[in-house]
Amino acid sequence: MTAAVSVAVVLGLTLGCGGGRTGHEGDGKSASGSAGGRAPEEAAGAVGPKKADEDGPTGRLRRAELEKTEVPGLVIEEAPPGTAGRGTPGSDQPACLPLANALGSEPDPKPLGSVVSTFAGAGEDDDLEGLLGTIRVSEYRPGEAAAVFRRLRDAAGACTGGFRMRTGEGESQVFDAVETVAAPKLGDEAAAFRLSNAVEEAPSLITVVRTGDVLSMFFATGLGDPERVQIPDRLVSAQVRKAVAVQRGGTGGDGDDAEGAGTEEG
């Protein structure tokens, strides 16, 4: 097994859940590299489906996506469609399956809508050097987000000794420890986990924040010093703030009121 498998688990699998952006405002490129920041079907004038999508859960969540340089020290990009693996992950331990599902491209249960972004360390911040990760923001049916959060937390507690998982494409990944670590004090509830890889030095990190029926999930690994791998609190705070603003009917912009979201700067 190589480090590429670990990176694929964090970066590749989570991109397959759909609903990724068609492009950042102002960068002039779409996911397919075309000019104008629009996907080909949008450029072709598919106004009806686009309007319906904008009014649905995924359309609302798109307004909560972070812009490219919105968080200092990080570059945030769209998650291009078609770059992730397919299929459902598995685990040798049923109790650990929620962790494998969280890392997979097909969340269980399927959310009403999702948007996915990638992030990477940038600039001169040594603590973020080599950092790679994804953000997945998903809206669920009433009660489902809380249930997913609970199952994930319970799985982490049951699988402290590690577990084996198989990606949807059949790649094997072995974790020799799962640790519940300090989580940012955000949203209705939050949790964070550190998964130690049995072969690679770089850990896989997961942070999840629930705000009502929306889960904001963050996945990260690193290509540098494994002891420095982190999911920056300022990234989590910024994303949760925008998700809360959109839930309250805002646009997700800086001017939207997110008071009461429990957000803290870190």
Positions of predicted regions on the chain:
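Extracytoplasmic/secreted envelope proteins and their assembly/folding machinery
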Residues: 62-68, 146-149, 153, 233-236, ...
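A small/polar (G/S/T-enriched), proline-flanked helix-loop surface module common
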Residues: 76-202, 235, 255-259
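Short glycine/proline-enriched loop/turn "hinge" motifs that connect secondary-structure elements
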Residues: 126-127, 207-211
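Short, well-ordered beta-strand elements
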Residues: 133-136, 213-222
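Short, solvent-exposed coil/turn segments at beta-strand boundaries
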Residues: 186-188, 209-215
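Mobile, glycine-rich extracellular loop/lid and propeptide segments
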Residues: 205-208, 225
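A short acidic/glycine-rich loop-to-helix N-cap element
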Residues: 219-235
